[in-house]
Regions:
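C-terminal outer-membrane/trafficking sorting elements
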Residues: 3-62
Length: 62
């Protein structure tokens, strides 16, 4: 499902967002809501870091 404005996460995490060419476009620490409203439409990689573990997910910004 495409994301429009915000991404909600159940726990406080560190998040890095990368564009399609690998440039980091957002980096936030200790958050549970990520505002993506200012990102251009497209595909991004979302790196979620929690308790020294890293998970990467693809998101589509609408």
């Amino acid at each position: 499902n495409p994301v429009k404005d915000k991404i909600n996460i159940n726990k406080n995490v560190d998040i890095n967002v990368y564009n399609y060419i690998g440039d980091m476009v957002i980096s936030k620490r200790n958050i549970n809501t990520l505002d993506v409203s200012k990102l251009s439409s497209g595909v991004y990689m979302l790196q979620i870091i929690y308790e020294n573990k890293s998970i990467t997910k693809q998101i589509i910004k609408k």
